[in-house]
A protein has these predicted regions:
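Active-site-adjacent betaalpha module
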Residues: 1-171
Protein backbone atom coordinates (compact mmCIF):
# COMPACT_ATOMS: atom_id res chain seq x y z
CA UNK A 1 0.00 0.00 0.00
CA UNK A 2 0.98 3.63 -0.22
CA UNK A 3 2.19 5.03 3.09
CA UNK A 4 0.81 8.49 3.76
CA UNK A 5 1.95 10.81 6.50
CA UNK A 6 -1.24 11.97 8.17
CA UNK A 7 -1.73 15.18 10.10
CA UNK A 8 -2.40 14.65 13.79
CA UNK A 9 -5.97 13.45 14.16
CA UNK A 10 -8.09 11.51 16.65
CA UNK A 11 -5.50 12.15 19.33
CA UNK A 12 -6.31 10.83 22.80
CA UNK A 13 -7.93 13.63 24.78
CA UNK A 14 -9.20 15.64 21.79
CA UNK A 15 -12.68 15.84 20.29
CA UNK A 16 -11.62 13.75 17.28
CA UNK A 17 -10.97 10.81 19.60
CA UNK A 18 -14.43 10.92 21.15
CA UNK A 19 -17.30 8.68 20.09
CA UNK A 20 -20.22 10.23 18.26
CA UNK A 21 -22.79 10.91 21.02
CA UNK A 22 -25.45 8.64 19.47
CA UNK A 23 -22.99 5.72 19.34
CA UNK A 24 -21.89 6.35 22.92
CA UNK A 25 -25.53 6.45 24.02
CA UNK A 26 -26.21 3.14 22.23
CA UNK A 27 -23.16 1.58 23.92
CA UNK A 28 -24.37 2.73 27.33
CA UNK A 29 -27.92 1.50 26.65
CA UNK A 30 -26.52 -1.89 25.59
CA UNK A 31 -24.38 -2.07 28.74
CA UNK A 32 -27.38 -1.38 30.96
CA UNK A 33 -29.77 -3.67 29.07
CA UNK A 34 -27.29 -6.56 28.97
CA UNK A 35 -25.74 -5.83 32.36
CA UNK A 36 -22.34 -5.99 30.72
CA UNK A 37 -19.67 -3.31 30.85
CA UNK A 38 -18.74 -1.75 27.51
CA UNK A 39 -15.10 -2.39 26.59
CA UNK A 40 -13.38 0.65 25.08
CA UNK A 41 -10.19 -0.49 23.35
CA UNK A 42 -7.44 2.14 22.93
CA UNK A 43 -4.88 1.95 20.15
CA UNK A 44 -1.92 3.98 18.97
CA UNK A 45 -0.28 4.59 22.32
CA UNK A 46 3.33 4.34 21.09
CA UNK A 47 4.57 7.48 19.31
CA UNK A 48 6.97 5.66 16.97
CA UNK A 49 4.52 3.35 15.21
CA UNK A 50 1.26 3.75 13.32
CA UNK A 51 -1.65 1.80 14.71
CA UNK A 52 -4.25 1.63 11.95
CA UNK A 53 -5.49 -1.69 13.34
CA UNK A 54 -6.96 -1.93 16.82
CA UNK A 55 -5.39 -5.40 17.00
CA UNK A 56 -1.79 -4.69 16.04
CA UNK A 57 0.61 -1.83 15.26
CA UNK A 58 2.33 -1.44 11.90
CA UNK A 59 5.78 -1.67 13.48
CA UNK A 60 6.26 -4.13 16.32
CA UNK A 61 10.00 -3.71 16.94
CA UNK A 62 12.33 -0.74 16.71
CA UNK A 63 16.06 -1.46 16.96
CA UNK A 64 15.25 -4.85 18.49
CA UNK A 65 12.98 -3.35 21.16
CA UNK A 66 9.33 -4.43 21.23
CA UNK A 67 7.03 -1.41 20.84
CA UNK A 68 3.80 -3.30 20.20
CA UNK A 69 2.30 -6.69 19.54
CA UNK A 70 -0.88 -8.42 18.44
CA UNK A 71 -3.65 -7.89 21.01
CA UNK A 72 -4.49 -11.52 21.72
CA UNK A 73 -6.63 -10.64 24.75
CA UNK A 74 -8.93 -8.44 22.65
CA UNK A 75 -9.06 -10.99 19.83
CA UNK A 76 -10.14 -13.72 22.26
CA UNK A 77 -12.75 -11.43 23.82
CA UNK A 78 -14.20 -10.68 20.37
CA UNK A 79 -14.33 -14.33 19.39
CA UNK A 80 -16.26 -15.27 22.56
CA UNK A 81 -19.30 -13.55 21.02
CA UNK A 82 -21.80 -15.23 18.70
CA UNK A 83 -21.28 -12.42 16.19
CA UNK A 84 -18.80 -9.60 15.77
CA UNK A 85 -20.18 -6.53 13.97
CA UNK A 86 -17.60 -4.15 12.54
CA UNK A 87 -18.14 -0.47 11.71
CA UNK A 88 -16.00 2.65 11.92
CA UNK A 89 -13.63 4.90 10.04
CA UNK A 90 -12.04 4.58 7.65
CA UNK A 91 -12.82 1.57 5.48
CA UNK A 92 -9.62 2.19 3.52
CA UNK A 93 -7.32 2.30 6.52
CA UNK A 94 -8.12 1.60 10.18
CA UNK A 95 -11.16 -0.63 9.65
CA UNK A 96 -9.51 -2.41 6.71
CA UNK A 97 -6.30 -3.09 8.61
CA UNK A 98 -8.18 -4.25 11.71
CA UNK A 99 -10.19 -6.73 9.63
CA UNK A 100 -7.03 -7.93 7.87
CA UNK A 101 -5.43 -8.62 11.27
CA UNK A 102 -8.63 -10.28 12.50
CA UNK A 103 -8.85 -12.50 9.42
CA UNK A 104 -5.17 -13.48 9.60
CA UNK A 105 -5.56 -14.54 13.25
CA UNK A 106 -8.84 -16.37 12.58
CA UNK A 107 -7.19 -18.33 9.77
CA UNK A 108 -4.29 -19.24 12.07
CA UNK A 109 -6.42 -20.19 15.10
CA UNK A 110 -9.73 -21.55 13.79
CA UNK A 111 -10.94 -20.78 10.25
CA UNK A 112 -14.56 -21.53 11.22
CA UNK A 113 -14.58 -18.34 13.33
CA UNK A 114 -14.76 -16.32 10.10
CA UNK A 115 -18.52 -16.96 10.04
CA UNK A 116 -18.93 -14.82 13.19
CA UNK A 117 -17.75 -11.64 11.46
CA UNK A 118 -20.29 -9.16 10.05
CA UNK A 119 -18.92 -6.04 8.35
CA UNK A 120 -21.41 -3.16 8.20
CA UNK A 121 -20.45 -1.66 4.85
CA UNK A 122 -22.84 1.29 5.21
CA UNK A 123 -21.39 2.24 8.60
CA UNK A 124 -17.98 3.22 7.27
CA UNK A 125 -16.45 5.18 4.44
CA UNK A 126 -13.00 5.40 2.84
CA UNK A 127 -10.55 8.26 2.85
CA UNK A 128 -11.08 10.26 -0.34
CA UNK A 129 -8.84 9.53 -3.31
CA UNK A 130 -5.71 11.65 -3.67
CA UNK A 131 -6.01 13.59 -6.91
CA UNK A 132 -3.32 15.58 -8.73
CA UNK A 133 -4.50 19.19 -8.50
CA UNK A 134 -2.99 20.06 -11.89
CA UNK A 135 -4.06 17.11 -14.03
CA UNK A 136 -7.02 15.70 -12.11
CA UNK A 137 -5.42 12.25 -12.27
CA UNK A 138 -6.13 9.94 -9.36
CA UNK A 139 -2.81 9.31 -7.62
CA UNK A 140 -4.07 7.01 -4.87
CA UNK A 141 -7.55 5.49 -5.07
CA UNK A 142 -8.46 4.80 -1.45
CA UNK A 143 -12.16 4.12 -2.24
CA UNK A 144 -11.12 1.36 -4.66
CA UNK A 145 -8.72 -0.08 -2.09
CA UNK A 146 -11.56 -0.17 0.45
CA UNK A 147 -13.94 -1.88 -1.98
CA UNK A 148 -11.30 -4.42 -3.00
CA UNK A 149 -10.73 -5.21 0.68
CA UNK A 150 -14.47 -5.70 1.31
CA UNK A 151 -14.60 -8.03 -1.69
CA UNK A 152 -11.67 -10.06 -0.33
CA UNK A 153 -13.24 -10.26 3.15
CA UNK A 154 -16.47 -11.52 1.58
CA UNK A 155 -14.51 -14.09 -0.45
CA UNK A 156 -12.82 -15.25 2.77
CA UNK A 157 -16.23 -16.02 4.30
CA UNK A 158 -16.95 -12.88 6.30
CA UNK A 159 -20.42 -11.39 6.00
CA UNK A 160 -20.49 -7.97 4.32
CA UNK A 161 -23.90 -6.55 5.18
CA UNK A 162 -25.82 -3.31 5.62
CA UNK A 163 -27.04 -2.00 8.96
CA UNK A 164 -30.57 -2.13 7.55
CA UNK A 165 -30.41 -5.86 6.70
CA UNK A 166 -32.64 -8.18 8.67
CA UNK A 167 -30.78 -10.08 11.37
CA UNK A 168 -31.56 -13.79 11.61
CA UNK A 169 -31.21 -14.46 15.33
CA UNK A 170 -31.78 -18.18 14.85
CA UNK A 171 -28.57 -18.60 12.85
Amino acid sequence: YVLCIWPYHAMLGCAGHAMVPAVFEAAMFHAIARKKQTNFETKGVHPLTENYSVLSPEVKKIKGRVVGQFNTRFFKALMENDRVYIAGQASSHCVKTTIEDLLREIQAVDPSLVDKVYILEDCMSPVAAIVDSDTGAVLVDFPKMAQDALDSFRAAGMHVVKSTDTVDITA
